[in-house]
């Protein structure tokens, strides 16, 4: 039985959320289970203390161990966030938030504590506010927080495909240059929409190519196996990505139950234990086996795919299990997103090759 070294723990602070976004992953949890069966709506301060006491006394932790505040909307349970951060001021924290509940009191607290990185999710900007500008104007304290601290970032979940370039430029000019672009995994993207996304994404790459800081954040090729295979150290390439669920991070629910990750929690699959009873590490044996034999497991169902052995994003075992009933059978919508992202990467790699060949002529 092997014991992992953990890089992070996710504290699932609450089931509650103020936004009710159409693409939210929590929908899968509540469609499968009665809320009353999922433990307290909010994590208590005592449970949070018990969780972190367990982590620091029982787990093997990496040097830069990070505590993530998760939900639901984490700021619904701000009192526990404040309690944990004040009790462990030496730790590194991160939080994802839709930003709507950030008020002056929270702004002042997070401004004083520079050991937390905050991701402001813009996924609901069209659904709730008509676009990025409307969201920024509606959430002034969150806007101020992100503008003042370059460690905070915006995660822009694209649903208006033809406006990607316009919206990205608005965020970069008016909010922050620390931006990640993503596509919702629980949204039905049409082929035409994904093609429009790919075209605008490539335009952004070319527009910001000489802006080293922004380009590093924006460019998917720099973080893909395909790019490393062409221009980097081939020894760094792993042909089948997956998140090593349960081997690097843990997800802990509102009553102290320990799960491999948030998607496995949604599926109620393979609960590892609790902070009160400990972890049964033998339940992770199959993940070690997958990690050591990636092609055997992660390549299953994929042999005929054009992206076989070069898929640009992680295979999400929990997402597959939730939607397909088999953790190795890729969810079709996720495959479609990977294919359009690969198209952008391949196009950029070809451009890079042509430039490098031109230099050597």
PLM region spans:
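C-terminal accessory region of radical SAM enzymes
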Residues: 199-232, 262-312
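Radical SAM enzyme core and accessory elements
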Residues: 1, 297-361
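Canonical Radical SAM [4Fe-4S] cluster-binding loop centered on the CxxxCxxC motif
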Residues: 2-46
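Radical SAM/AdoMet-radical enzyme domain recognition
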Residues: 48-70, 77-193
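Cys/His-rich metal-chelating microdomains
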Residues: 16, 20, 24-27, 264, ...
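Short, small/polar residue-rich loop motifs at catalytic or cofactor-binding pockets
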Residues: 242-247
């Amino acid at each position: 039985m092997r014991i992992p070294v953990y890089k992070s723990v996710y504290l699932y602070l609450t089931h509650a959320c103020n936004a009710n976004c159409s693409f939210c992953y929590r929908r899968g949890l509540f469609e499968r289970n009665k809320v009353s069966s999922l433990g307290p709506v909010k994590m208590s301060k005592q449970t949070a203390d018990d969780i972190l006491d367990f982590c620091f006394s029982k787990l093997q932790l990496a040097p830069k161990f990070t505590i993530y505040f998760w939900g639901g909307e984490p700021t619904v349970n701000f009192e526990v966030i404040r309690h944990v951060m004040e009790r462990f001021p030496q730790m590194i924290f991160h939080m994802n938030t839709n930003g709507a509940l950030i008020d002056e009191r929270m702004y002042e607290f997070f401004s004083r504590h520079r050991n937390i990185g905050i991701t402001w999710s813009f996924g609901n900007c069209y659904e709730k506010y008509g676009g990025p500008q409307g969201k920024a104007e509606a959430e002034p304290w969150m806007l101020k927080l992100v503008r003042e601290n370059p460690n905070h970032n915006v995660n822009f979940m694209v649903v208006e495909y033809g406006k990607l370039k316009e919206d990205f430029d608005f965020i970069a000019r008016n909010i922050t240059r620390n931006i990640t672009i993503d596509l919702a995994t629980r949204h039905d993207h049409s082929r035409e929409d994904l093609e429009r996304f790919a075209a605008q994404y490539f335009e952004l790459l070319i527009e910001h190519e000489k802006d080293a800081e922004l380009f590093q954040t924006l460019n998917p090729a720099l973080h893909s196996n395909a790019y490393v295979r062409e221009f980097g150290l081939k020894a760094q390439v792993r042909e089948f990505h997956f998140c090593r669920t349960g081997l690097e991070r843990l997800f802990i629910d509102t009553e102290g139950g320990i799960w491999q990750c948030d998607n496995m929690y949604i599926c109620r699959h393979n609960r590892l234990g609790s902070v009160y009873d400990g972890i049964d590490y033998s339940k992770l044996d199959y993940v070690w086996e997958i990690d050591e034999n990636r092609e055997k497991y992660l390549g299953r169902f994929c042999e005929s795919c054009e992206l076989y052995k070069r898929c640009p994003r992680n295979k999400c075992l929990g997402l597959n299990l939730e939607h397909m009933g088999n953790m190795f059978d890729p969810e079709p919508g996720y495959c479609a997103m990977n294919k359009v992202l690969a198209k952008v990467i391949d196009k950029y790699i070809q451009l890079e090759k042509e430039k490098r060949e031109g230099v050597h002529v």
